[in-house]
């Protein structure tokens, strides 16, 4: 069957809309839930929220569960990031962000950290971590264990 010009245009438009819908949404989820405190580029806010990039992430990214557990379960206590000390808490986002959106968000944060060839997070991976017990304090303990800090 031969498509007429209008048919071709409609088919092309449908394909464009379908492909846009399939684009990763991590940057949008990040903008909605994270950028107010951590800034759009992940540079953080002095005295409020630490940077999501810097030398500490080279170690933290070695434990693939760290970042999702912090976002799912929260983090509370004293941490030092890029020579700045933060004392506070980040709320858990498990109730507000779906597994699929969380996977996209975490993959976006990897990109902010310069982990261009990082393995993208998957919704199934987030779902499995969501069932694990955890709390803001357990996220702090995990962080301390990875970084070798007290």
Spans of features found by a protein language model:
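N-terminal signal peptide c-region/cleavage motif recognized by signal peptidases
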Residues: 17-21
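Bacterial N-terminal signal peptides that target proteins for export
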Residues: 2-13
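Flexible coil segments in periplasmic/lumen-exposed cytochrome c-class electron-transfer proteins
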Residues: 88, 97-150
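Protein kinase-like catalytic domain
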Residues: 38, 72-75, 113
């Amino acid at each position: 069957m031969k498509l007429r010009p209008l048919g071709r245009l409609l088919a092309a438009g449908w394909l464009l809309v379908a492909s846009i819908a399939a684009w990763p949404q991590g940057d949008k989820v990040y903008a909605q839930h994270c950028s107010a405190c951590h800034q759009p580029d992940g540079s953080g806010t002095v005295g409020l929220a630490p940077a999501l990039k810097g030398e500490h992430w080279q170690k933290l990214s070695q434990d693939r569960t760290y970042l999702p557990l912090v976002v799912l379960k929260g983090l509370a206590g004293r941490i030092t990031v890029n020579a700045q000390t933060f004392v506070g808490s980040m709320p858990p986002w498990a109730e507000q962000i779906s597994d699929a959106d969380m996977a996209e968000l975490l993959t976006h944060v990897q990109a902010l950290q310069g982990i261009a060839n990082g393995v993208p997070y998957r919704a199934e991976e987030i779902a499995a971590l969501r069932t694990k017990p955890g709390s803001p304090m357990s996220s702090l303990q995990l962080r301390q264990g990875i970084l070798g800090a007290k």
